Amino acid sequence: MEGEDRLVLSEAMKTLFLNPPSFENFDGGAGARWPATRETESFWYAAELTYPAGVLSDSKLRDAPPRKATSTQTAEVARRYDFVVVFTSCVGFQSDVRLARRLKDVKPEIKIAFVGPHVRVQPTESLKASRDIDFIVRAEFDHAVVEFARQALQLFPQGGTVLG
């Protein structure tokens, strides 16, 4: 109504879906960062992240490898978000763990989920690799991360800890 103050709540945490930075001059895409180089580069789009990014209205998908984005540049982008979903692979896992540390340095309260092949095959080891990883999703993650983004905002509007 005109002239009436209204409170509008976001439907979910502001979420960044991230295909993280790759290695310099390394090839990658389709959910992997290959430990090899070629004469030409080819990057598949981050298809796995498109569905959940499309479902949450206040989210963004950032495909870092084709942009040649560094971890520093990525952390600067991530500081504007409350929740980051990192699609990790086996070859890039340790680099992604270091990125998670950088994200927490920039914004300590940010929530970080790791998804993808590495956490699927090594869930316990992945979760124990760093305290900076808040949780992992072992299987199909698209609905799980959307549900977390929506429910966490309702359960912890002022921030807080999710046990698990």
Question: Where do the protein language model's features map onto the residues?
Answer:
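Glycine-rich beta-alpha loop elements in corrinoid/cobalamin-binding modules
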Residues: 48, 52-164
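Short glycine-rich His-centered loop
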Residues: 13-43
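A detector of low-complexity, intrinsically disordered, Ser/Thr/Gly/Pro/Ala-rich segments
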Residues: 11-13, 159-160
